[in-house]
From Swiss-Prot:
NCBIfam families: DTMP_kinase. GO terms for biological process: dTDP biosynthetic process; dTTP biosynthetic process; dUDP biosynthetic process. The gene is tmk. Belongs to the thymidylate kinase family. Keywords: ATP-binding, Kinase, Nucleotide biosynthesis, Nucleotide-binding, Transferase. This is Thymidylate kinase.
Length: 206
């Protein structure tokens, strides 16, 4: 069986990507199932036992910026080795709620960690590995903030300012501009039904 594909969902907190992730994966599984392929749904930080432990630390404990980035990439290496690469090798497709673009956007754009440091970690952990497709849920920070305020207690990142998320969004859009062959941008300021119509277009193009 041919190697599987790796799809990532990205966007600032409150963009709505997690809301649509399972719906997208269910539709994708309907298409792939007859060929004997499966859709593996995962997330970052997380995806493995170690990754989920790191997630609790990263989302809830203050720490040095470089420590934060190193922990992100440590969890990513484990995620690649134990979940993503084995699934792709057996022909399954993997859909992840966040991947390396999030680290460039949050730790780089949002927190100001120099890009060259993140690029060095990316090369070490991933080599040349990149997602086949990244779906970027784009929304103005003010709309995302209102959505975040309507749900559960926020974690460390969700509690950041609109200015932080404006920088994070700008970095996401910069990365999308640099890799247009990989990114599809979804206008997630739209109602849920309209966002799903956009995602149907993404599915149709796969």
């Amino acid at each position: 069986m041919a190697r599987g594909k790796f799809i990532t969902f990205e966007g600032i907190d409150g963009a709505g990507k997690t809301t649509h992730l399972q719906w997208f994966c269910d539709r994708l599984q309907e298409r792939l199932g007859p060929a004997g392929r499966h859709v593996v749904v995962t997330r970052e930080p997380g995806g493995t036992r170690l990754g989920e432990t790191l997630r609790e630390i990263l989302l809830n404990q203050p720490m040095d910026l470089e420590t934060e980035a190193l922990l992100m990439f440590a969890g990513r290496r484990e995620h690649l080795a134990l979940v993503i690469e084995p699934a792709l090798a057996r022909g399954d497709w993997v859909v992840s709620d966040r991947f390396t673009d999030a680290t460039f956007a949050y730790q780089g754009g949002g927190r100001g960690l120099p890009r060259d440091k993140l690029e060095a970690l990316e090369r070490w952990v991933q080599g040349g590995f990149q997602p086949d497709l990244t779906v970027l849920f784009d929304v103005p920070p003010q709309i995302a903030s209102a959505r975040r305020g309507a749900v559960r207690m926020p974690d460390k990142f969700e509690s950041e300012s609109d200015a932080f998320f404006a920088r994070t969004r700008a970095e996401y859009l910069r990365r999308a501009q640099e890799a247009p062959h990989r990114f599809v941008i979804v206008d997630s300021s739209e109602p849920i039904a309209q966002i799903r119509k956009q995602l149907e277009g993404v599915l149709a193009a796969l």
